[in-house]
């Protein structure tokens, strides 16, 4: 479980405090504040050129973990197989089992820089395969999938008519190239549940806020589970997240730079040892 070593930026905290002072302590709509969903849609457009209908294709969840859980529960029938690259986040396997699915593990290899290859994916697909979980950028390996890697995966996904759950919670923490979402490829938005949140990019782990973007037919089923199990994500957190989305780009960039400096500091002795 990733925990940023930064505090939530003050202007984001202030917005949460202000919402309490203004008495905004009631339920929001089940799917989340309209203002927040609008900002999420704008963020995805400016960052990745992806267009989502805030009213029909975006919902706010209690962290990305809830989004993973309800996506699996909404999509799986008993015995459906879910391909899960490992190592990765601890929740994928138990959530699959709880939803009645069967986890199928693909061990990522160091020689492939811990990226999933089309050959590895193809090798584990069966007639029961329904979903591919894409945990990239990856925790704990730090692996990313570049555009060419994703193109090969997309081809296999389409050939076998699979759905994808793309956990992109670390999308802001790449240090060389920008993150590429698998949902941005032609024909993939219609078969992808994109999951993201505020914990890593904005150092908001304790605020417990994430979101899911999906085709309307899938999102409707996810929302049914969410509204009866959760009602809505925390109201105070949602107002703070609006501020994060509107004015948090500089904070994200500063934290990314600090993480990158730490990466350089840790990796430099290893590089020097390899040279010597």
Label every PLM stretch briefly.
Residues 1-63, 70, 244-247, 253:
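N-terminal small-domain helix-loop-helix segment of the aminotransferase-like
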Residues 74-96:
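Conserved PLP-anchoring active-site segment centered on the Schiff-base-forming lysine
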Residues 104, 109-178:
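Active-site phosphate-binding strand-loop segment of PLP-dependent enzymes
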Residues 185, 189-260:
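Conserved core segment of the aminotransferase class I/II
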Residues 264-276:
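Single conserved hydrophobic/aromatic residue that forms the stacking wall/gate
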